[in-house]
Amino acid sequence: MTQCASRRKSTPSRAILGAFASARGTRWVATIAGLIGFVLSVATPLLPVVQTTAMLDWPQRGQLGSVTAPLISLTPVDFTATVPCDVVRAMPPAGGVVLGTAPKQGKDANLQALFVVVSAQRVDVTDRNVVILSVPREQVTSPQCQRIEVTSTHAGTFANFVGLKDPSGAPLRSGFPDPNLRPQIVGVFTDLTGPAPPGLAVSATIDTRFSTRPTTLKLLAIIGAIVATVVALIALWRLDQLDGRGSIAQLLLRPFRPASSPGGMRRLIPASWRTFTLTDAVVIFGFLLWHVIGANSSDDGYILGMARVADHAGYMSNYFRWFGSPEDPFGWYYNLLALMTHVSDASLWMRLPDLAAGLVCWLLLSREVLPRLGPAVAASKPAYWAAAMVLLTAWMPFNNGLRPEGIIALGSLVTYVLIERSMRYSRLTPAALAVVTAAFTLGVQPTGLIAVAALVAGGRPMLRILVRRHRLVGTLPLVSPMLAAGTVILTVVFADQTLSTVLEATRVRAKIGPSQAWYTENLRYYYLILPTVDGSLSRRFGFLITALCLFTAVFIMLRRKRIPSVARGPAWRLMGVIFGTMFFLMFTPTKWVHHFGLFAAVGAAMAALTTVLVSPSVLRWSRNRMAFLAALFFLLALCWATTNGWWYVSSYGVPFNSAMPKIDGITVSTIFFALFAIAAGYAAWLHFAPRGAGEGRLIRALTTAPVPIVAGFMAAVFVASMVAGIVRQYPTYSNGWSNVRAFVGGCGLADDVLVEPDTNAGFMKPLDGDSGSWGPLGPLGGVNPVGFTPNGVPEHTVAEAIVMKPNQPGTDYDWDAPTKLTSPGINGSTVPLPYGLDPARVPLAGTYTTGAQQQSTLVSAWYLLPKPDDGHPLVVVTAAGKIAGNSVLHGYTPGQTVVLEYAMPGPGALVPAGRMVPDDLYGEQPKAWRNLRFARAKMPADAVAVRVVAEDLSLTPEDWIAVTPPRVPDLRSLQEYVGSTQPVLLDWAVGLAFPCQQPMLHANGIAEIPKFRITPDYSAKKLDTDTWEDGTNGGLLGITDLLLRAHVMATYLSRDWARDWGSLRKFDTLVDAPPAQLELGTATRSGLWSPGKIRIGP
């Protein structure tokens, strides 16, 4: 009876067969529209675009003179130059630069640029440190010489002295067929002046291959593809309706009900979507609170910088690296962010997509996914709380910024929901919509493969539905809409780019990297266990709780073939999504830990399922539940065995952000490991005890639903960490306080960073009571200095950095500046001073010597201390060497003594009243110049004078110190000093913290010249931004290092004086030159056209 009934149920009725037979027109529409959508979508990358062309020609305006034109691609498509020999004849005897593609004094200019240089004896054409041709000057000035021709293209670089012959009588020309010899161009620079002579010409084709827009034909094809795809999906929807089971819209909106639940009236908005529970309130409040006070993700500054520049550039360029190539084919989400920048650049506004994604994920989880997992899950409050808390704890460390993992998590969940809809109701329209969702999720980033994993997990049941429907309506009416649905993403990805440009962008990224092989996937998990921000407490828990729940569920499902009221199919597909994603992640080119944020939604569903599977109703033996509790304690011990670190400024004020959390000297990890040992031991005892043992109220309470309790505890820890950070930092910068201030126009960290515009303005006047007895160092040395000299500083001591050979990119000009002054300073010192200090006004005293060592002491004269006010919160001493001091990063660091002694007025002479140990950033540059900070708030209000007391009691040559006189600096906020209009090179790490500063833009292949550079803290600058933005990798430092001189400025984080917030560097031009005028035009290019490969090689 059962088999017959089942067969009758699965056999279509005559009415349904007749309906399918009469739907011939709908089938044709689905077939034709689907094929049209598919063909047009696939053709989109090949269709022509309109390219904006740009040419750099020189001389300009008929005059000789340098011009700037820094190429965002660094090198041109081709370069030609013609120099009449008359120009050489007219040059002075000493010669000079006829032309160069960079300033001669630029950093590594000879290594990067092309020059035509005349010396007293020769005329040299050099390109990237390669001598293309060198000719004696007398030959070039002879009447036979007509002109010098230089070309540099993909075919190589060649020079030809027209009119001159080599010894064999052949034309005098030479060169190398190497495409990597194309020079970098930041302009055209020359020593020539006056009117341009006839015949002198330079021309460069700027690489603007990515500056394109669709032609009318391509635009029509895109519109046609989208319309045809929509029509095909509607036709598929009509075919789905022919089975007589109601509107597909009702089925899409109908909530998943347990199989045993009674049917009800179908409503447009299901009842479950109109309910509101305490869990909903907690989740929504948690997301909103975290949006305001929570930490941001690692690449927020990177992505915001790209989004802010995209509108001016005309495409979404990755201009921090990779030669300004576009993000395509993965990047449509960034274009949404670029549109949002038209409203505001504030963090709260820009992060709204991730907030919305998190809220929608919870709605889908609570209304669709958990009910689909079976009546046991749907009826379990602990399961809902587990999903809620795991979603929050996984979202907080990964998805509260601009990174796309939150959007991908939502896309994967929507795909899973649609696949389950398709299976439950045997409809193909939800499956087609799932294909669209998966395609757009993949179009966000390669990690969007999680949505593809959802498709693969449901592939077999979907194929069964397709086979059943194929018998009724044929194959093409069903497959064609699917093809269109899967390829319509191409109309978005290639809307303004072509197949050729996207392939070139992909080649550049793969060649430069990071681009890691599939077998290095272990690195992702290795980074997770390192005691760094990538392996911090929050990031470990966000992923490991998902992994623990996943493997626990797999084990239980394999052991128990049938679990009452748990839907095996959806449960196994959910596990398949996670396992499939772990597999697909192997093939993504990067192995960053932040990719784990894409597991947030499916991990929450997994936690809910596991909560039911380990509950007493399923695991009846307390031994098994206790074993799972022990595993949770072990997971917590592992998670807490690291720092409570958060990315960049999000960590300010957070407890234990650079150390393992402790309670009374005992690490929290140790406490949880002890609990693990107790729980594991008790589980082992239960293994040998009678089955009924261990079912007391306490054990049952602990083991009934541990997942939501543990996840809720961790969520509370994360929130408490941020709240503590705000309280400890107030009123200075913290992430949460900055977001609150944004409501009234705050500018983030720029409001709290204080800049000293003129370091020579704040020096105090020495009291001249002992002026007659001052030693040779003047008031700085006091009465009887011992061991201090005006030149007691080693060579190459620079500000806030240590010298490394060879120099890294992004270093200051001080690294390459002369090591001695041409004229001695005020006290005879020839040591260059940092921060713009004027040696003619600022004395120096140091203990460094290569000779015999001695113990050195210095007590300066008293300096008159101005009355305290809010505008002058610091006394600063610029110093170098190994100095004892305090810093946020390292706490107290030992060293030699440099303290500030303050005095009160006495009945006669001043009365010393106390000494202050400096706040010293120290960091990794203990022997560099830096500013020691002494807060006025820590001095008595009636202190009237201060003096420097310095002692170098070590006989080790490396333990030297150097000091300058104390000063009370005039400070302005960075926002006031830099403003919002001057172009700034915002390092990729800092962009979100400085939303009001104007990033340097680029358009038509030419980058804007920045006035300043803002960097993160010293370690992040050295290890992250300097190397990532290196010109070798196609980064912006390739422009600034070659064209500008950088000088670090004296800056301080308001009321957080001991913190290394980062640095502000001011750029000075090597050559004062106006921007070049470009010759712009347009050209229509096919989807396969390419001007050649971008130069990547050395």
Curated annotation (Swiss-Prot):
Entry's Gene Ontology molecular function annotations: arabinosyltransferase activity
Membrane-traversing stretches: 28-50, 217-239, 271-293, 402-419, 434-456, 472-494, 541-558, 570-587, 597-619, 626-648, 663-685, 698-720
GO terms of biological process kind: Actinobacterium-type cell wall biogenesis; cell wall organization
InterPro entries the record matches: Arabino_trans_C, Arabino_trans_C_2, Arabino_trans_central, Arabino_trans_N, EmbABC_dom1
Tagged with keyword Cell membrane: yes
Keywords: Cell membrane, Cell wall biogenesis/degradation, Glycosyltransferase, Membrane, Transferase, Transmembrane, Transmembrane helix
A Pfam short name: Arabinose_trans
EC number assigned by the record: 2.4.2.-
Entry GO CC: plasma membrane
Entry membrane topology: Multi-pass membrane protein
Cell compartments where the protein resides: Cell membrane
Function: Arabinosyl transferase responsible for the polymerization of arabinose into the arabinan of arabinogalactan.
Family: Belongs to the emb family.
Stated name of the protein: Probable arabinosyltransferase B
Gene of this entry: embB
